[in-house]
């Protein structure tokens, strides 16, 4: 891990801790932007579940729209927006390649989830058409009956993705739109640079 990458990661960690201790309702909420095989972009909000020097991890159904996007075009952008921080909010953007996390990591995280969240992962065919809420409720009841009295295992089609950063951008909001921006970026040889940008 290079010094600049370590600096960017430490900056994120400090801001994330600040957000967790602030008025933010959900500091771990992040927008994940992906593109499908045709290059059509889409974005949605998910929760950050872990981060370290290897990257930023979230979990989902692998056959969801974002799961399919990431398996055919393994690049993503993350966006954190913490409006309550500092003078006028802080925004962090992270861009990078995407990898599936290991089965062991996915198993460990799935085992830590509330039981009804585990059941929901089995009952939901995420991003597919649903005829009615009653249909979903029936699927939930069926899964509950299937696993009554025993642990709920992780479904094969559910797991984690790790975004491996190739760029960080930190935006510090200020009055009169006189913001401050810093960008850390790796080149093709994984050499990191740091630049200040006009707001």
Curated annotation (Swiss-Prot):
Kindly give the PROSITE patterns that the UniProt entry links to this protein. Answer: PYRIDOX_OXIDASE
> From which domain of life does this come?
Bacteria
* Residues annotated to bind FMN: 44-49, 59-60, 66, 91, 126-127, 171, 181
Pathway it acts in?
Cofactor metabolism; pyridoxal 5'-phosphate salvage; pyridoxal 5'-phosphate from pyridoxamine 5'-phosphate: step 1/1; Cofactor metabolism; pyridoxal 5'-phosphate salvage; pyridoxal 5'-phosphate from pyridoxine 5'-phosphate: step 1/1
> How cofactor binds (record note)?
Binds 1 FMN per subunit.
Query: What family does the database annotate?
Result: Belongs to the pyridoxamine 5'-phosphate oxidase family.
Q: How does it assemble?
A: Homodimer.
Briefly, what is this protein's role? Answer: Catalyzes the oxidation of either pyridoxine 5'-phosphate (PNP) or pyridoxamine 5'-phosphate (PMP) into pyridoxal 5'-phosphate (PLP).
Q: Which InterPro entries match?
A: Pyridox_Oxase (IPR000659), Pyridox_Oxase_CS (IPR019740), Pyridox_Oxase_N (IPR011576), Pyridoxamine_oxidase_dimer_C (IPR019576), Split_barrel_FMN-bd (IPR012349)
| UniProtKB keywords | Flavoprotein, FMN, Oxidoreductase, Pyridoxine biosynthesis
Which biological processes are named by the entry's GO terms?
pyridoxine biosynthetic process
HAMAP family annotated for this entry?
A: PdxH
Which cofactors must be present for this protein to function?
FMN
Stated EC number for the protein is 1.4.3.5
- Record has Oxidoreductase as a keyword: yes
Catalytic reactions on record: pyridoxamine 5'-phosphate + O2 + H2O = pyridoxal 5'-phosphate + H2O2 + NH4(+); pyridoxine 5'-phosphate + O2 = pyridoxal 5'-phosphate + H2O2
What protein name is recorded for this chain?
Answer: Pyridoxine/pyridoxamine 5'-phosphate oxidase
Which terms in the Gene Ontology molecular function aspect does this entry carry? FMN binding; pyridoxamine phosphate oxidase activity
The scientific name of the source species is Xanthomonas axonopodis pv. citri (strain 306)
């Amino acid at each position: 891990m290079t010094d600049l990458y370590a600096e960017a990661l430490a900056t994120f960690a400090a801001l994330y801790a600040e957000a967790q201790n602030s008025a933010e309702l959900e500091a771990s909420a992040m927008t994940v932007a992906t593109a499908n095989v045709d290059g059509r972009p889409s974005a949605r909000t998910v929760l950050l579940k872990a981060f370290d020097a290897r990257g930023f991890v979230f979990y989902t159904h692998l056959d969801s729209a974002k799961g399919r996007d990431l398996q055919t075009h393994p690049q993503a952008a993350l966006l954190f927006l913490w409006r309550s921080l500092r003078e006028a909010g802080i925004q962090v953007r992270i861009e990078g390649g995407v990898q599936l996390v290991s089965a062991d990591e996915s198993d460990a995280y799935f085992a830590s989830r509330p039981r009804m969240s585990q059941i929901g992962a089995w009952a939901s065919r995420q991003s597919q058409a649903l005829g009615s809420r009653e249909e979903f409720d029936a699927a939930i009841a069926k899964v509950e009956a299937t696993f009554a009295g025993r642990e709920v295992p992780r479904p094969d089609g559910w797991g984690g993705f790790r975004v491996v950063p190739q760029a960080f951008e930190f935006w510090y909001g200020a009055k009169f739109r006189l913001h401050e921006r810093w960008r850390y970026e790796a080149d093709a040889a994984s050499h990191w640079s740091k630049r200040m940008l006009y707001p």
